[in-house]
Amino acid sequence: MKKMPMRKRFGQHFLHDSFVLQKIVSAIHPQKTDTLVEIGPGRGALTDYLLTECDNLALVEIDRDLVAFLQKKYNQQKNITIYQNDALQFDFSSAKTDKPLRVVGNLPYNISTPLLFHLFSQIHCIEDMHFMLQKEVVRRITAEVGSHDYGRLSVMAQYFCDNTYLFTVSPQAFTPPPRVESAIIRLIPRHNFTPVAKNLDQLSHVVKEAFSYRRKTVGNALKKLINPSQWPLLEINPQLRPQELTVEDFVKISNILN
């Protein structure tokens, strides 16, 4: 079967290292009864491993040439469904069976952040997620309060999920090699976060507004939203910088606006 060319506009870097692939599958630990969804399967390197472990696998691929390639490669497989679709627009609940989805993939680095936010909006139908991402993005997702990497993505990802940095992947594991290191992350949805955000759009707006002015105090950064008399009610020091606020702090700010 002929090789498929990479398309730069899709941010394609195909994983080929068998040791890394086995390590990823070990981290996912798929079960026969799982419903797995793989985003951006490429030529099917990870797919091949997953098919041996899982009886229900869905692939979401935007590249029509790769879709044709995958359809031909897996035309004898009965336990696989291929969707030609943009993952940023895909309704993940449409792939759901009687069990929550386990979502995996080597996410295109040029759309990884908006794709994560799209997945957060459908978190109710997801059991867990294992992704290959740019190492810098994984560091931001898992960043601690007060650190340089802590920001909007950290707050929103940590509101929706418990996140674990699993391991780093060298550029040499890909064809062509990306210019940056990659990392594998596990995200497990949190369905009982306390306090609960009353309005998720409001929470996202507050967090985005605050980190647009991360060098300012949070009192100044959010002065269009919060008046000075509200800070004592929130029990938050308005002289703190946005990166010094916890996820819980941002939820409290969001909730007082509703």
From Swiss-Prot:
Task: Give the enzyme's EC designation.
Answer: 2.1.1.182
Q: Which PROSITE patterns match?
A: RRNA_A_DIMETH (PS01131), SAM_RNA_A_N6_MT (PS51689)
Binding annotation for S-adenosyl-L-methionine:
H13, L15, G40, E61, D86, N106
What InterPro entries does the record tag this protein with? KsgA/Erm, rRNA_Ade_diMease-like_C, rRNA_Ade_Mease_Trfase_CS, rRNA_Ade_methylase_Trfase_N, rRNA_adenine_dimethylase, SAM-dependent_MTases_sf
Which cellular component appears as one GO term in the record?
cytosol
Reaction catalysed by this chain? Answer: adenosine(1518)/adenosine(1519) in 16S rRNA + 4 S-adenosyl-L-methionine = N(6)-dimethyladenosine(1518)/N(6)-dimethyladenosine(1519) in 16S rRNA + 4 S-adenosyl-L-homocysteine + 4 H(+)
UniProt KW keywords = Cytoplasm, Methyltransferase, RNA-binding, rRNA processing, S-adenosyl-L-methionine, Transferase
Single Gene Ontology MF annotation:
RNA binding
Which domain of life does the UniProt lineage start with? Bacteria
Q: What is its main location?
A: cytoplasm
Q: Name one Pfam family in it.
A: RrnaAD
- Please state where this protein is localized: Cytoplasm
HAMAP family attached here?
Answer: 16SrRNA_methyltr_A (MF_00607)
Protein family (similarity comment): Belongs to the class I-like SAM-binding methyltransferase superfamily. rRNA adenine N(6)-methyltransferase family. RsmA subfamily.
The record's function comment reads: Specifically dimethylates two adjacent adenosines (A1518 and A1519) in the loop of a conserved hairpin near the 3'-end of 16S rRNA in the 30S particle. May play a critical role in biogenesis of 30S subunits.
- This protein's name: Ribosomal RNA small subunit methyltransferase A
Q: Which organism is it from?
A: Coxiella burnetii (strain CbuK_Q154) (Coxiella burnetii (strain Q154))
Report which gene this protein is encoded by: rsmA
